[in-house]
């Protein structure tokens, strides 16, 4: 009986190991800018870098640049922790509302989905002027984030803010987003409507 169980376990493990490379090959996901792989030349030959779906890489998207628009400042966890609660700063969760409600958010953040940023520039101190916005004289530092370093939501929201007239030098981009925040075990709060 024990021999039969050991044989079944060995056969099962062998089948898993054989299938693993095939699964990994089928599960390639986008790196950035519509590229699925990137080849670099090293001293001992070519090396191809790719992304495969793993539990930490389940969030859709592709790698975002450290600076999503000229003039924007990239920030990390310590910067976010130190800015929470400051009167001259605003932490904006640019994820869609369902993500915020389902997963939670960073304490002190306000949810303005990236698709709604251009319609809510008054939240950042801009005044509506005709069909556009007047952001002259705004001083609020806006710290924006979304799901992760592969999420295009906050970069798109940041570009919309700049397009509407918000000064890029007052925008800070937390590229790691909610995923990095939770990976580091930092405090989260429930999302609200």
Where are these regions (language model features)?
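Positively charged, proline/Ser/Thr-rich regional signature most characteristic
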Residues: 67-144, 191
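A mature extracytoplasmic/lumenal domain signature
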Residues: 95-98, 116, 146-148, 175-178, ...
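Short, solvent-exposed loop/turn and secondary-structure capping segments
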Residues: 102-105, 124, 155-158, 184-185
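Flexible, polar/low-complexity N-terminal or interdomain linker segments that lie immediately upstream
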Residues: 23-103
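N-terminal signal peptide c-region/cleavage motif recognized by signal peptidases
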Residues: 19-21
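Bacterial N-terminal signal peptides that target proteins for export
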Residues: 1-9
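Active-site neighborhoods of enzymes that stabilize oxyanions during catalysis
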Residues: 184-193
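Catalytic cysteine-centered active loop of the rhodanese-like fold, especially the PTP/DSP P-loop
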Residues: 126-181
């Amino acid at each position: 009986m024990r021999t039969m169980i050991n044989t079944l376990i060995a056969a099962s493990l062998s089948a898993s190991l054989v299938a693993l490379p095939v699964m990994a090959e089928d599960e390639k996901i986008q790196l950035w800018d519509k590229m699925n792989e990137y080849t670099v030349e090293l001293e001992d030959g070519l090396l191809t870098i790719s992304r495969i779906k793993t539990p930490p890489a389940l969030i859709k998207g592709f790698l975002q640049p450290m600076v999503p628009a000229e003039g924007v400042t990239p920030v990390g966890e310590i910067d976010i922790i130190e800015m929470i609660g400051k009167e001259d700063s605003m932490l904006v969760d640019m994820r869609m509302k369902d993500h915020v409600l389902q997963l939670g958010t960073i304490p002190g953040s306000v949810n303005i989905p990236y698709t709604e940023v251009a319609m809510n520039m008054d939240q950042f101190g801009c005044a509506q002027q005709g069909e556009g916005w007047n952001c002259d004289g705004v001083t609020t530092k806006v710290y924006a984030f979304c799901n992760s370093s592969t999420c295009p939501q906050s970069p798109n929201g940041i570009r919309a803010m700049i397009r509407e007239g918000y000064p890029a030098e007052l925008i800070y981009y937390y590229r790691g987003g909610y995923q990095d925040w939770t990976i580091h075990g930092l405090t989260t709060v429930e999302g609200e409507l």
